[in-house]
Amino acid sequence: MRYTTDIKKSPPQLLKTFAVCDISLYDICDYNVTRDQCKELGCCFYKGVCYKKVVPIYVQMFSTLIVLVTGIIIITIIYRIVQEIKRQMKLSMNSTPKASKKRSAFRPFSRDPSRAPSRSPSRTSSTLSSRSPTTAPTTAPTTDPATDPATDPATDPATDPATDPATDPATAPPTDPSENPP
């Protein structure tokens, strides 16, 4: 039995499977070796010369591009997940009972009809006289005329010039033709 030495090779890499023997691209391994010795060195034998076997540049560029695109996709996914978590936390903080009580307690100019103060007096004379003289009567919050649609002159039909009979030319009293010279 003949004893052969085991040549330990490095584990094959993914790109090494694409390695080719392109003479114009590679360096020379050794000049004076046989084909078998060249293959043991992991090189490529071509026309009596042993060349190094490497991965072409286009394969390296393609693999780099794949790695970059994958990295960008992963970073984008992580960013969106973080933004979604922040948005959910913000919504959950806004919906806490304390925040909702604070929000509903302060509404100085509410347009909600159920909360709007009425224009008629809410207190009768009997409720005002039953108070002690040391307690000052409190007034109901008044609405701002600039924001209240009921007192807005632009929407008030009594002050609208288009419907006001005093300024309407169709209902204006006729003038005497002698007053207007031709």
UniProtKB/Swiss-Prot annotation:
Tree of life domain: Eukaryota
Annotated transmembrane regions: 57-77
Location(s) in or outside the cell: Membrane
InterPro entries for the chain: TEX29 (IPR031685)
All ranges on the Extracellular side of the membrane: 1-56
Region (Disordered): 91-182
Any one Gene Ontology cellular component term annotated for this protein: membrane
Main localization category: membrane
The name this protein goes by in its record: Testis-expressed protein 29
Lineage of producing organism: Eukaryota, Metazoa, Chordata, Craniata, Vertebrata
